[in-house]
Design a protein with these regions (language model features):
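Active-site-adjacent beta-strand anchor residues
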Residues: 1, 70, 95, 113-114, ...
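Central regulatory/effector-binding core of bacterial HTH transcription factors
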Residues: 1-28
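Short, conserved clusters of charged catalytic residues that mark active-site
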Residues: 2-6, 27, 53, 97, ...
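Positions that flank functional sites
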Residues: 5, 26, 120-121, 139
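Paired acidic/hydrophobic, glycine-rich loop segments that form the ligand-binding mouth/hinge
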Residues: 17-21, 111-115, 132
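Short, well-ordered beta-strand segments
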Residues: 19, 43, 68, 113, ...
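C-terminal regulatory
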Residues: 31-110, 119-138, 167-172
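A late-sequence structural motif
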Residues: 134-172
């Protein structure tokens, strides 16, 4: 798993022939196709909300509260907090580098985190998760970059990626 913020380096190095990136500029020798926007929401468990945030998204409490990051390169939590309160988290950080385990850690109250809308919207509606800042999602624009060469296999992969994106992402 590579974060879309870091996949362009894999294309540049030649380690991959195609990748989902958050970079709209084509890597030399590649073509770029806009896929859509992945929407994320800052969430926490109801228990975490009461224990660390006094039941409200107070900027000072949120900044100091424990955070769950995917890994050390994960910038989504920082990006959310900079946009919402103007600074980055200063509380303890937990790293959980597996998607389902990451969401599970947030649900168990290890900290607050930014989860994809597809993974948290039902849980927000059911009350299993609390959205910390309704109306303040983190949107990440995604692009498909692939080497500019003729390859029936790469063409089929590209078609599948674009079809999946059209079905699951917000339009650019």
């Amino acid at each position: 798993r590579e974060d879309e913020e870091h996949t362009t380096s894999l294309l540049r190095s030649g380690r991959v022939m195609a990748a989902v990136t958050s970079t709209p500029e084509a890597v030399q020798g590649c073509t770029v196709t806009g896929l859509g926007t992945m929407r994320y929401h800052a969430v926490c468990s109801p228990e975490f909300n009461e224990r660390h945030l006094d039941g409200r998204a107070d900027p000072d409490l949120l900044r100091q509260a424990p955070v769950v990051d995917f890994d050390r390169r994960d910038e989504l939590q920082n990006r959310f907090l900079r946009g919402f309160v103007g600074s980055e988290p200063s509380g303890p950080r937990n790293h959980v580098p597996a998607s389902e385990d990451f969401a599970h850690a947030v649900m168990l109250g290890f900290g607050w985190g930014v989860l994809p809308e597809a993974h948290c919207s039902t849980r927000i509606r059911s009350g299993e998760l609390v959205e910390l800042a309704p109306g303040h999602p983190v949107d990440v624009r995604l692009y498909w970059q692939r080497w500019n060469l003729r390859s029936s296999v790469l063409d089929r992969v590209s078609e599948a990626v674009c079809a999946g994106a059209a079905a699951h992402l917000h339009r650019l």
